[in-house]
Regions:
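Active-site-proximal loop->helix
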Residues: 2-61, 132, 136-145, 161-162
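Glycine-rich phosphate/pyrophosphate-binding loop at beta-loop-alpha junctions
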Residues: 3, 11, 46, 74-171
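Hydrophobic beta-strand scaffold residues
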Residues: 15, 38, 67-68, 126
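Short, conserved active-site loop motifs that form the nucleotide-linked donor/cofactor pocket
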Residues: 36, 66, 170-171
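Hydrophobic residues at beta-strand termini and immediately following loops
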Residues: 41, 69, 156, 176
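Phosphate/diphosphate-binding glycine-rich loops and adjacent basic-rich segments that engage nucleotide
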Residues: 58-66, 70
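Short, intrinsically disordered, charge-balanced linker/junction segments flanking boundaries
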Residues: 171, 178-182
Length: 182
């Protein structure tokens, strides 16, 4: 949302960001300071039509001229990391990379960097670092989307396979504490 608000502000576009009301006050204040209209909704599971992703889609469909970025399922997110982030990491490391890990929000960074690095060297290990309370660790370890516990780490800890995560080359998964994640 912050990236969208930054670009929209610079280009003179209106931006509307929909997010759960459980997000931090600092994030909300930053978005507003960047000129975004902020709509907060109660936290809800993805299966609910009240989930912030579904709410944002509906608002975009009902607003003339609106573009729905859908950063979770729009694979342009992943592609940007294949074409830029992975290239930057590869070049800065002179191609000497054993592995890459990160937590998942949209899935774009992990999947995109993973795909980009694996295209250069299939032996690079790609690992998911998932906080307690998130479901992806269980999915990649045991094939079941199941979450136990909770986390205060904001913006990470996905509970579904997003469009960006589909076909992600994840070799390992780690359960991490909030302290490790932050």
């Amino acid at each position: 949302g912050i990236g969208i608000a930054l670009v929209a502000n610079a280009k003179g576009y209106k931006s509307t960001i929909v997010m759960p009301e459980t997000q931090s006050r600092e994030k909300m204040d930053t978005l507003r300071a960047l000129g975004a209209e902020l709509i907060t909704v109660p936290a809800a599971p993805y299966s609910s039509q009240c989930h912030f992703v579904h709410t944002s889609r509906r608002i975009a469909e009902e607003t003339e001229g609106a573009v729905w970025a859908n950063q979770f399922d729009n694979v342009a997110n992943r592609r940007a990391h294949i074409e830029t982030t992975a290239e930057e990491i590869w070049n800065q490391m002179d191609g000497k990379i054993d592995g890459f890990t990160c937590a998942v929000g949209t899935g774009g960074t992990l999947a995109g960097v993973g795909m980009g690095l694996k295209a250069k060297d299939e032996n690079v290990t790609i690992a998911l670092s998932d906080p307690h309370g998130a479901a992806l660790y269980e999915y990649y370890a045991h094939g079941e989307l199941k979450s136990e516990g909770n986390s205060v780490a904001e913006g990470i800890g996905q509970g579904r396979i997003t469009g960006n995560l589909e076909d992600a080359p994840i070799d390992r998964q780690y359960r991490i504490s909030d302290e490790e994640g932050l």
